[in-house]
Amino acid sequence: MAPSDENECRRLLTTGFLHNGPAAVRYPRGSGPGASISPGLEPLPIGRGMIRRRGRRVALLAFGAPLAAALEAAEAFDATVADMRFVKPLDEAMLAELARTHEILITIEENAIAGGAGSAVNEWLAAAGFGVRARQLGIPDRFIPHGDRGAQLAECGLDAAGIRRTILRALSGEKAVLGETA
């Protein structure tokens, strides 16, 4: 499970606690984006994401904390933004709908690109027979210099500016290179 803010973290922790089986919650170091805390702790349906913004051509699939940067970047391109919430199981119905209605899907996660959530999305797209263009944004398989969280996100192309660069490259038809940063 990959919460995008403090409220979702609380609800996903509740979801994991009530789930009859193993559960893991990904969350970044430091503080959250500052979401106001709602009083309820209702669990979320396992394996269900949520569309946070409707757009055209490009869909940004945010796993966890990068949701805020994805929403900011989406404004410049009228992109759809999905809060995926779950790495396993993936929301296959939402993925199918996004693959049918968009030219490009870009996964965004604060995790390793190789073997991460984006890889799981690409495996599912291939197995389901979707030929949509896909890109993965995440932490490349190389040393990331020490720094504050914002600087490290920028280094990996996981800030709003980096996401915008990736969208622009994808729309221009530039080929993706595994592990590249925006």
Where are these regions (language model features)?
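Thiamine diphosphate
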Residues: F17-A182
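Conserved thiamine diphosphate
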Residues: M1-L18, T166
